Design a protein with these regions (language model features):
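Conserved alpha-helical elements of sugar-nucleotide-dependent glycosyltransferases
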Residues: 49-57
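A short beta-strand-loop structural module common to alpha/beta enzyme folds
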Residues: 65-78
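Charged, often flexible domain-edge or linker segments that flank or initiate folded functional domains
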Residues: 2-16, 91-94
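Flexible, glycine-rich loop/tail regions that form catalytic "lids" or insertion modules at the edges
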Residues: 38-41, 103
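N-terminal [4Fe-4S]-dependent radical SAM core
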Residues: 8-38, 45-46, 209-240
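Short helix-loop-beta junction
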Residues: 56-68
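Glycine-rich beta-alpha loop elements in corrinoid/cobalamin-binding modules
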Residues: 75-217
Length: 240
């Protein structure tokens, strides 16, 4: 069966950026898992695949029988133009499925200049950019990586952030849209996990020079101070 993606690949540079199927990529039947997770890197394929953290978390999640982690990267301008022309939404490499139907999307925040790409990727997926505009029909959107320590510039976008090393915490924050908890109940539950920051559960006050004056919890489940997660035993985690 020829898909829309197959049809437009001949019109773009470096089409193998969008085909998947590389050595060591993971193929599962989405119907056999409980959670579909999209690991999103807001840059092109070449840059994303050079990132060691992606490989660690990708295989860490895919080692679980109940989870399917797929890769989602920012298309280059020629591919983006073709996607818009053909009404094609942002997709995952492994299955080619639209990420709108996933349970959770995790963006790694490696550098601030990628923030506009995060917004663009959500728009290409037809997913509301602001967390407050997304109900349970949309994926939960989380952020991690070095820039998550300064979360406020993009706090309105994300449902929550994972601070520190995610090899442990990623197992504790799985979200399935068909589960019993609604989005707020889910966020209240994970807000009690070490290293999890839920922006909507805090009021941020600014000084006149736009620096942060105070961060005050507005939800009883929110920790007064969120501390980064530290991996205590690297022998227990996946290493590519």
């Amino acid at each position: 069966m020829i898909t829309t993606r197959d049809k437009i690949l001949s019109a773009v540079m470096k089409p193998t950026r969008y085909t998947g199927g590389e050595l060591n990529s993971v193929i599962k039947n989405p119907a056999d898992v409980d959670v579909r997770f999209g690991f999103c890197f807001a840059d092109t394929y070449e840059i994303a695949m050079s990132h060691l953290g992606l490989k660690i978390l990708y295989h860490t999640l895919n080692d679980r029988e109940d989870t399917y982690c797929e890769r989602v990267f920012a298309p280059w301008t020629d591919m983006e133009e073709e996607m818009k022309k053909h009404g094609m939404k942002l997709f995952a490499l492994e299955t080619g499925d639209e990420i709108t139907h996933f349970d959770m999307l995790g963006f790694t925040l490696q550098y601030e200049l990628s923030y506009s790409n995060i917004v663009n990727m959500l728009m290409l997926a037809d997913i509301p950019v602001r967390a407050k505009d997304r109900d349970e029909s949309y994926p939960i959107v989380c952020g991690g990586g070095p820039c998550a320590y300064n979360a406020e510039p993009v706090a309105d976008i994300f449902d929550f952030f994972m601070l520190g090393e995610g090899e442990d915490s990623i197992h504790e924050v799985k979200w399935k849209k068909s589960g019993k908890k609604n989005k707020r109940d889910y966020l209240e539950a994970i807000a009690e996990i070490e290293g999890i920051y839920v922006p909507s559960f805090y009021d941020v006050e600014y000084n006149d020079d736009n620096t942060v004056k105070s961060v005050t919890p507005n939800n009883p489940h929110a920790k007064p101070k969120v501390r980064k997660r530290i991996m205590k035993d690297f022998n227990a985690t996946y290493a590519p």
